[in-house]
Amino acid sequence: RLGTPAVRPGDALFCRTDVRFTHDYVTPMAAALFREFLGAEARVEGTDSTYAFRDHLTFLDRVMSPKHREMGLLAHANALKTTQEAFCKAQGIRLYDEVPGGGSEAICHNAVLEDIALPGQLVIGSDSHTCTAGALGAFAFGVGATDVANAWFTKDIRVVVPDVVRVDLHGAMPDHVSAKDVMLKILADPYIKEGKAIGQVLEFAGDGVTRMNLDERATLTNMAVEGAATTGI
């Protein structure tokens, strides 16, 4: 998968992705880059493992202020929707779209965790909380439009191997304590508060993690990005 038997922190290489997804803010930007640099006839590679979500802007028409409407922001947002739909249709990408009455078929990072990603996979997404899928034991992290456009065409992503910090959890949580409480405590640790975890991977381990269900583990990995980590696993 990597083309080399082993890697160490700091190594830079291209890795083959297993899952690629974008939401409604980034799909149009990545599509524009895709067409500009690869040509109008370029095709997305691996559409069976490529997904798009309309989940960030679905209620915008209900909450946008009159002032912002007058500025034309709602029209711009609707243009993002049209562009995303057209690109997905042309390329054969599965789009989790709006549903009648408002809302979306799915929230991207939740759907990837629940229905798409598998343990051991490499998952990239345009959402900062792509790291949620780390609860499965996947290496999942957020990327920008340029990386997405490249991965659409090649299925590859450039990775600088990050350092790993292990977080050992032991014992059982009392009834009044949730996984979010645990993660907030971790985020308050000086190691993270002083920025030492920036760009690193938070590896959660120990019998305390073993006792957690998947939703609780997903809370830990979802919030890894709040400590400026690349991901949690």
PLM region spans:
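Fe-S-dependent hydro-lyases/dehydratases of central metabolism
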Residues: 1-233
